[in-house]
Curated annotation (Swiss-Prot):
Coiled coil: none annotated. InterPro entries: Rossmann-like_a/b/a_fold, Universal_stress_UspA, UspA. It comes from Thermus aquaticus. Belongs to the universal stress protein A family. This is Universal stress protein in QAH/OAS sulfhydrylase 3'region.
Length: 137
């Protein structure tokens, strides 16, 4: 049924659980598993040398998150994408570009009441995705 499954991964506990689900779904369907980690762009107004330092730190963090996702899912580096941009937009663009049949991602609830609500990124992806979205908490 699914040929390409996209895992949106940010390193959170929800994302770690989503990684296990995405890996199992990919194995069950014989599908390609693609991992996407999006990181926010560094604001231009920081100026030099602050911009370069902030960008370096952001990229280092993104690489660590990607390495963690690769370790959890077993995907090769070429299937673990780092994308700069707002997370929901980057996930949606990757889903379109890679022709994903399913997006798997974590929700982000905080506390007893917060767990009833989706995070803003999850809401946007669910509302605009070109394919089904599986949310994991």
């Amino acid at each position: 049924m699914f040929k390409t499954i996209l895992l949106a991964y940010d390193g959170s506990d929800h994302a770690k659980r989503a990684a296990a689900v995405a890996k199992a779904e990919a194995q069950a369907h014989g599908a390609r598993l693609l991992v996407v980690h999006a990181y926010e762009p560094v604001p231009d107004y920081l100026g030099e040398p602050f911009f370069e330092e902030a960008l370096k730190r952001r990229l280092e963090r993104a690489e660590k998150v990607r390495a963690e996702a690769m370790a959890l899912t077993g995907v090769p580096r070429e299937d673990a994408l780092l994308l700069q941009g707002r997370p929901a937009e980057a996930i949606l663009q990757a889903a379109i570009g890679e022709k994903a049949d399913l997006i798997v991602m974590g929700t982000r609830g905080l506390g007893a009441v917060g767990s009833l609500f989706l995070g803003s990124q999850s809401q946007k992806v669910v509302a605009e995705a070109p394919c089904p979205v599986l949310l994991v908490r």
